């Protein structure tokens, strides 16, 4: 089986001078994950993963999401909220958990596309994020820089790799088993919706945009033949220079851009992409295999070396880190823990249901945030909306890795670890979320709000979902 993609890269309804317009229906569909057995999925445009949106840097997009999902097996309405993960969106378009779209409603989201990176869109509806995403509500969204260095692989050699895992019953039904509101681990690894696929690759360099869209599972990626992975980008764009690593840890919500060069392999060579077990994740023999690359064809005439400096803007992360540290106005600490009496996951002992704010930096303020794993035997991938951050330190067994030293919005916090990050807050004022991206933890209720500045647009009332019917004008 070969890697396949849900749709072509450009499927917008129409364009104008600076905006691309899309319409996506959230609806039930079916997929053949087990041979000859149909599995019900909930997908954007009825597909898993959803349509790949490929945007040019600097062109705004408007995406109309229509909720046609109806009810679940317990006759509960399947409400949604869409978050474009990695976008500096205005509060009303950021996927605030309580800004829900019910079945029969739609909402138009406006995205700025002002940074070139591998993003993804997924459900963020309050207390339904995990099950909605597990059923399939996730898709890739790439913002490309037309002026990027030409020696970085492009076109057919620029490949999104959407990772997820599923547990299926014998009849093909997706089994959501959250271990007492702790985690969901499947025994089937999917790449772009396909279980353990094979991909034919030419004898040249490929850029793989890895995106972990799972619920709880992290991966420690490696090539079966021992060849190093060359990391060129993090969550929020290119690193300054390529970084080689033998293993690459990728938690839920994280993205890494990796170059693999197949030039020195003869046609017929097979190379497996594997994963080491992650501490405290439920592992199966089947989850140690991800996919296989099958080398085909003769030598490729044009296979230039990767540039030593990846970014055309000359951005210096070390200088930026020092500049931010010289402007720090305050430090904050956030302890991610577990209230076993209430069966809730907490941030500083509070939950989403408690309301209020966990922080209120002003627009332009530079702060250091310390994330503390409160223990209990779990790792937490911590996601902060709106801003890109730079990691400063991680204690315990696994120190900061060189491939993590770019702009990021998700930080993998190992069991018992503390992480320090620094960021300048903005560009928008308003309320945003931070949470654990183990989506079971998020739903039960490890998520808190912070507000940048004062007086920003309300994330719920400014642009609420509206009824969708035949009288709604098209985009």
Q: Which residues does each predicted region cover?
A:
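Extracytoplasmic beta-sandwich strand-turn segments characteristic of Greek-key/jelly-roll folds
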Residues: 44, 48-55, 61, 79-115, ...
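Extracytoplasmic copper-binding redox domains, predominantly the cupredoxin/blue-copper superfamily
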Residues: 34-35, 64, 68-98, 162, ...
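A long-range scaffold signal marking pre-active-site subdomains of enzyme folds
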Residues: 1-90, 109, 114, 124, ...
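Structural beta-strand segments of beta-rich domains
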Residues: 59-61, 204-208, 365-367
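Histidine- and aromatic-rich segments of cupredoxin/plastocyanin-like copper-binding domains
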Residues: 89-101, 167-313
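N-terminal edge beta-strand
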Residues: 33-54, 186-198, 339-366
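Long, hydrophobic, well-ordered secondary-structure blocks that form the structural core
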Residues: 100-150
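Extended terminal and domain-junction accessory segments
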Residues: 1-27, 134-164, 238-379, 424-431, ...
């Amino acid at each position: 089986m070969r890697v396949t993609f849900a749709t072509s890269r450009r499927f917008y309804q129409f364009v104008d001078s600076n905006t691309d317009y899309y319409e996506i229906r959230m609806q039930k569909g079916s997929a053949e994950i087990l041979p000859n057995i149909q599995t019900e999925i909930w997908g954007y445009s009825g597909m898993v993963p959803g349509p790949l949106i490929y945007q040019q840097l600097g062109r705004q997009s408007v995406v109309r999401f229509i909720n046609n999902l109806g009810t679940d097996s317990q006759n509960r309405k399947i409400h949604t909220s869409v978050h474009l993960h990695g976008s500096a969106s205005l509060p009303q378009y950021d996927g605030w958990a309580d800004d829900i779209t019910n079945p029969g409603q739609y909402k138009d989201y406006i995205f700025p596309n002002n940074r070139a990176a591998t993003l993804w869109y997924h459900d963020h509806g309050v207390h339904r994020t995990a099950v909605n995403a597990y059923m399939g509500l996730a898709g890739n969204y790439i913002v490309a820089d037309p002026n990027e260095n030409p020696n970085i692989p492009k076109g057919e050699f620029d490949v999104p790799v959407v990772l997820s895992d599923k547990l299926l019953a014998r009849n093909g039904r997706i089994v959501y088993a959250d271990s007492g509101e702790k985690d969901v681990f499947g025994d089937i690894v999917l790449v772009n919706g396909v279980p353990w696929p094979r991909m034919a690759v030419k004898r040249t360099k490929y850029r793989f945009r890895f995106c972990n869209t799972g619920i709880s599972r992290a991966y420690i990626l490696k090539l079966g033949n021992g060849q190093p992975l060359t990391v060129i980008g993090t969550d929020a764009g290119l690193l300054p220079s390529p970084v080689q690593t033998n293993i690459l840890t990728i938690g839920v919500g994280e993205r890494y851009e990796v170059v693999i060069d197949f030039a020195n392999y003869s046609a017929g060579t097979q190379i497996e992409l594997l994963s080491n077990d992650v501490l405290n994740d439920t592992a199966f023999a089947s989850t140690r295999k991800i996919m296989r690359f099958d080398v085909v064809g003769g030598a490729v005439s044009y296979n230039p070396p990767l540039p030593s400096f990846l970014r055309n803007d000359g951005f210096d992360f070390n200088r930026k880190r020092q500049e931010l540290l010289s402007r720090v106005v305050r430090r904050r600490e956030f302890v991610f823990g577990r209230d076993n009496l209430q069966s809730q996951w907490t941030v500083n002992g509070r939950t989403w249901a408690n309301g209020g704010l966990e922080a209120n930096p002003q627009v332009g303020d530079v702060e250091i945030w310390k994330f503390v794993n409160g223990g209990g035997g779990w790792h937490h991938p911590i996601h902060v909306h709106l801003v890109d951050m730079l990691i400063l330190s991680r204690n315990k067994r696994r120190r900061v890795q060189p491939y993590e030293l770019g702009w990021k919005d998700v930080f993998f916090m190992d069991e018992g670890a503390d992480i320090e990050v620094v960021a300048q807050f903005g560009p928008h004022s308003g309320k945003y979320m931070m949470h654990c991206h183990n989506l079971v933890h998020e739903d039960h209720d490890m998520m808190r709000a912070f507000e940048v500045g004062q007086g920003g647009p309300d994330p719920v009332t400014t642009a609420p979902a509206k009824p969708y019917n035949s009288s709604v004008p098209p985009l």
